[in-house]
Amino acid sequence: MKMFDNIKNVGKLIRLERIFDKKSEKTVIIPMDHGVSSGPLDGIKDMRITTNAVADGGANAVLGHKGLVRHGHRGYGRDIGLIIHMSAGTSISPDPNKKVIVTTVEDAIRLGADAVSLHVNVGAESDFEMYRDLGLISETCEQWGMPLIAMMYPRGPKIKDEKDPEVVAHAARLGAELGADIIKTNYTGDPDTFKEVVKGCPAPIVIAGGPKTNTDEEFLQMVKDAMHAGGKGVASGRNVFQHKDVKGITSAICKIVHEDAEVKEALKEIKI
């Protein structure tokens, strides 16, 4: 894949091919790490059911904490990539923006991971600790040939707008500078400003799905706009696993991301 030409580590390249479509060179990731931060939300109470639905819908990978492997591994159905999330923090913590590392790259390898991810809140009072974690873990990932996804979110006392193009661009560039292979960050809400974010980041960017949207059309249009602006995929949780038709919405996303389908065409994948 051309966008990974700068990566010379063969192990990383092999694993990246498991979570990116070789033809479109893009990815659809379904994060299911919300149980740690927010508790047993609807849609991920039974992770096997959700994993099966998104796999059947064509998703390239699921993302979650190491418990996802134990409680979400199916042993049947369509294969799907596995990304182990290394960061944790809760909504009921005194500092919800603080994320700590709760597992290792070596543990992720033992669990069969195709990539690892960690979360950095850029602008949080504890952000310097998360920067240190990202920089050090990127070195370990390089040693083991493990792709690293950095979730770079502008959040903190000085952040007035988490979709501000300047702060999103800064967050994305920061993640790439500290060694991430893939950046997950907010879509700015506008294709023109997001193009500038992409231009300023040497690593491919996957957009976050964001809060649950009012309509499927609104959500899919965001995905469409982001892909045309240079995004290399989408990582969406609640807009997928809390949908009435999990398989259908996953398939609709895949139609747009991998086939450049129009929103109206993609909506036909949703049956409920």
UniProtKB/Swiss-Prot annotation:
Residues the entry annotates as binding 1-deoxy-D-threo-hexo-2,5-diulose 6-phosphate: 33-37, 153-155, 209-210, 237-238
Active-site residues (renumbered): 33, 153, 184
Keywords: Amino-acid biosynthesis, Aromatic amino acid biosynthesis, Schiff base, Transferase
Parts forming coiled coils: none
EC number: 2.2.1.10
Tagged with keyword Membrane: no
Pfam families: DeoC
Domain of life assignment: Archaea
UniProt keyword Amino-acid biosynthesis, yes or no: yes
GO MF annotation list: fructose-bisphosphate aldolase activity; hydro-lyase activity; transketolase or transaldolase activity
SUPFAM superfamilies, per database record: Aldolase
GO biological process terms held by the UniProt record: amino acid biosynthetic process; aromatic amino acid family biosynthetic process
Catalysed transformations (reactions): 1-deoxy-D-threo-hexo-2,5-diulose 6-phosphate + L-aspartate 4-semialdehyde = 2,3-dioxopropyl phosphate + 2-amino-2,3,7-trideoxy-D-lyxo-hept-6-ulosonate
InterPro entries in the cross-refs: ADH_synthase, Aldolase_TIM, DeoC/FbaB/LacD_aldolase, DeoC/FbaB_aldolase, FbaB-like
Role noted for this protein: Catalyzes a transaldol reaction between 6-deoxy-5-ketofructose 1-phosphate (DKFP) and L-aspartate semialdehyde (ASA) with an elimination of hydroxypyruvaldehyde phosphate to yield 2-amino-3,7-dideoxy-D-threo-hept-6-ulosonate (ADH). Plays a key role in an alternative pathway of the biosynthesis of 3-dehydroquinate (DHQ), which is involved in the canonical pathway for the biosynthesis of aromatic amino acids.
Assigned protein family: Belongs to the DeoC/FbaB aldolase family. ADHS subfamily.
NCBIfam families: ADH_synth, PRK07226.1
Subunit structure, as described in the record: Homodecamer.
UniProt protein name: 2-amino-3,7-dideoxy-D-threo-hept-6-ulosonate synthase
Source species taxonomy: Archaea, Methanobacteriati, Methanobacteriota, Methanomada group, Methanococci
Gene coding for it: aroA'
